[in-house]
Amino acid sequence: MTETFAFQAEINQLMSLIINTFYSNKEIFLRELISNSSDACDKIRYQSLTNQSVLGDEPHLRIRVIPDRVNKTLTVEDSGIGMTKADLVNNLGTIARSGTKSFMEALEAGGDMSMIGQFGVGFYSAYLVADRVTVVSKNNEDDAYTWESSAGGTFTVTSTPDCDLKRGTRIVLHLKEDQQEYLEERRLKDLIKKHSEFIGYDIELMVENTTEKEVTDEDEDEEAAKKAEEGEEPKVEEVKDGVDADAKKKKTKKVKEVKQEFVVQNKHKPLWTRDPKDVTKEEYASFYKAISNDWEEQLSTKHFSVEGQLEFRAILFLPKRAPFDMFEPNKKRNNIKLYVRRVFIMDNCEDLCPEWLGFLRGVVDSEDLPLNISRENLQQNKILKVIRKNIVKKALELFEELAGNKEDYKKFYEQFSKNVKLGIHEDSTNRKKLMELLRFHSSESGEEMTTLKDYVTRMKEGQKCIYYVTGDSKKKLETSPFIEQARRRGMEVLFMTDPIDEYVMQQVKDFEDKKFACLTKEGVHFEETEEEKKQREEEKASYERLCKAMKEVLGDKVEKVVVSDRLATSPCILVTSEFGWSAHMEQIMRNQALRDSSMSAYMMRKKTMEINTTHAIVKELKRRVEADENDKAAKDLIFLLFDTSLLTSGFTLDDPTAYADRIHRMIKLGLSLDDDAEEEEAQAPVAAAANSSTGASGMEEVD
């Protein structure tokens, strides 16, 4: 019985994109299909560790590639776990994977088709070279079924009880007319070597071997008759008569005989078992692509072994690009493959490395873990904890080595800086080493980024703190009023523009005995001479009345108004409490859909307003307030200064309309416009209309 199903909309869209768009790199389809077959073999082998009977009559796990020139088909077959009917329907058509939409978006943004495997939709790459695909699959839990589609929006699933598959999956590609090159033996050998040489199972390619054998005329006639029945003609080559008498009596000829047989294409032993000195850069790149489905080579490699009480070998690869779903909350990490004595155990062991290292790819092969270890036991296993600790240690070594190459480290940091910062937040043991990997723009670094270590070496004599500000962008922070005094004193300020920086700075307090000081918060004081301190005290006393008046006008909008020692050219700013949220953090938390309102209210407490006593506006405001505390223009100016301080300090306006009204009033003052006269002009047409209406009514009454 045959059933017809419609493809899920996103899958149908993806297939249409693959079929109707020209891509030169079509060869990746074979890599994707072999990779899927390898995964299927991994799954059945893992099951067999606890239940040997699942292998049944097909104990040998292998992958076969079979070209058929006569029927113009290419078959990829494995003896893996196979698929049930439900698997065929769901996995190959009706349920879109999370990566389907992401992959299409990546393609439309100019991405390479080679990335398809990273998004979990590699099977559909078959339609790059085939106009029809047939999938026959047999799972131990179900009968055999055949899935087939020509990508016309639907697919069929048919029960196949007479299938010769004992277990596994057979994918038959009916090749397009212009893709017949993938039936050539040499082409297939090259592709397997290029993309799949280090797959952990035998990849058997069906090849044709031609041999020559001598036959007598009688044997040759019989062979010719037999081949004639089969529609073939033997190729004959004459040989010279020998001197032997028997040879003269029985004339012999050489006949070419063609036999088909499977030949293993990936004969190299596992790469991680070899000495790193004997492995070439090309072999590492090939192996990395095989285990990661990446189309690019890795950025860097760490190949190491640990011996002693505990033995294991590992290869860690650092990709050039971050995975598209790296920080998805429900994503299961499958970046490190776990082997025990060369036997694959699993590729989603989340306890093998911490979450912040989830971008690393690689393999770990342990000599000490039991083959039949369960996922539950892994979490408590002491050996695994030691392996995890060593992976983190070697990863840090890899990053430190990479830091020696400025260009490569820049590529790494652009892609994975968030992971490094997440590590600082989560890994207190390695926090100091991770902090050395940080890079920031600063007021002195220009377009380059600086390390914390370099910042400390450039600190001014007597400078006790590492100064920094947080915000949306480097451009905004370069003109921030918070850094004015620091710049005037020749002190460098770090610019932290990544939202995760806010969380990082909650965990770190100092670096090389130098405390961090956020210039947007209270409690920041620059070193002053005795004369400067005296002058500051005099200014505070002189402006005490203005500060008090401003507080009375602003009321609950501010905690207090004080004389600033961090401003140089701006009239005023708003600073937060030392342990509260910065303006940037407030903005981040406001955008959190599930934020804790009570926590937000506590952390977003009233701000302190700081005024610059050297600024002309503040001086004039002081004069006006001292002359008349009820001066309306002075009150308007205080509110206007508060609102502009909100904006320049990185906060949002509570009442934009009131702010606009004040600006409009100031514009009128600048243009010497009279509010009362303007109101009379605005009311005149209304009054005229009213009088006109009244007059008309009166006339009607007279009539």
UniProtKB/Swiss-Prot annotation:
Family annotation (Gene3D superfamilies): 3.30.230.80, 3.40.50.11260, Heat shock protein 90, C-terminal domain, Histidine kinase-like ATPase, C-terminal domain
Compartments it resides in: Cytoplasm
GO terms assigned for molecular function: ATP binding; ATP hydrolysis activity; ATP-dependent protein folding chaperone; unfolded protein binding
Keywords: ATP-binding, Chaperone, Cytoplasm, Nucleotide-binding, Stress response
Protein's UniProt keywords contain DNA-binding: no
TPR repeat-binding, short sequence motif: residues: 699-703
Protein's UniProt keywords contain ATP-binding: yes
Cited CDD domains: HATPase_Hsp90-like
SMART domains: HATPase_c
One Pfam family in the UniProt entry: HSP90
Annotated region described as Disordered, given as residue ranges: 211-247, 678-703
Biased composition (Basic and acidic residues): 224-247
Binding residues annotated for ATP, in chain numbering: N36, D78, F123, R375
Biological processes per GO annotation: protein folding; protein refolding; response to heat; response to unfolded protein
Cellular component GO terms held in the UniProt record: centrosome; cytoplasm; nucleoplasm
SUPFAM superfamilies referenced in this protein's UniProt entry, alphabetically: ATPase domain of HSP90 chaperone/DNA topoisomerase II/histidine kinase (SSF55874), HSP90 C-terminal domain (SSF110942), Ribosomal protein S5 domain 2-like (SSF54211)
PANTHER family: HEAT SHOCK PROTEIN 90 FAMILY MEMBER
Function summary: Molecular chaperone that promotes the maturation, structural maintenance and proper regulation of specific target proteins involved for instance in cell cycle control and signal transduction. Undergoes a functional cycle that is linked to its ATPase activity. This cycle probably induces conformational changes in the client proteins, thereby causing their activation. Interacts dynamically with various co-chaperones that modulate its substrate recognition, ATPase cycle and chaperone function.
Family, per entry: Belongs to the heat shock protein 90 family.
Record note on domains: The TPR repeat-binding motif mediates interaction with TPR repeat-containing proteins.
Assembly notes: Homodimer.
UniProt-listed HAMAP family: HSP90
Annotated protein name in UniProt: Heat shock protein 83
Source species taxonomy: Eukaryota, Discoba, Euglenozoa, Kinetoplastea, Metakinetoplastina
